[in-house]
Amino acid sequence: MLDYDDAMTSSTSSGERAPDPRPARTRAAIFTAARELSADDGEVTVNALAKRAGVSRAAFYSHFTGLDDLLGAMLQEMFDAAWERGRADGAAGYTIVHHVQHGYAMMAAYIERHHAFLRGALDWKSSHRTYMILTGTMAALHVEALKRMPDRLPPRPGIEALARSLTGGELVHADHWLVATEEAARAGEELDATELLEVMLATAPSWYIGLGPDEPIPAAELLASARTYGEDAADQH
């Protein structure tokens, strides 16, 4: 089994102490095990995760307090990628509505890429706390975008309420898409989230996404860009 001693360090040829890579490997193994168990319809428990990852229960608990914490960390990958994409877009001089459109595309690309894990995660024995972490983090992304478009904001409600409403819409459409594509996924078909992205953008306020009701929605183009950017944290773990 993998060693979980996070405090260990290793010596380099120059005599300096380098961070021990074992904790990162343990964390990566747990992430992979969670994705595989979810995709295989296996029951996701700490015991099952530890066995699949080849680590001890103690190793699991040295990284995560429980399934809630693990699921939150895995979902956080997507948001970290979204924040990074936002910084890159800002540095490149993109407008705020361009950033918003790509934020939705990042969400759709993540769901498309990890649909098996996310579909399985719906059945995890996690608590309401996980849902609150998810919605809170998603809402924070919308808050940052809304703050950067003061001239576009409606007179009411406030930014926080708007962000929660936008988040709720995203989650409803994502959940519906996961359920609607379940049969195709089980048949081994390659899924395409272009329609999901188009629906999310079509139902978002036009003042927020910068597209009028009659304007074409470049969902395929946006999703293609998001796919290449976020071959994302999943490949880093």
Regions found by a protein language model. Name each.
Residues 2-43, 48:
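Basic, helix-initiating cap at the start of DNA-binding domains
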Residues 37, 77-85, 89, 114, ...:
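A short secondary-structure junction motif
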Residues 37-69, 73:
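Helix-turn-helix
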Residues 87-116, 127:
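Hydrophobic alpha-helical connector segments
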Residues 119-121, 186:
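Short, hydrophobic secondary-structure boundary micro-motifs
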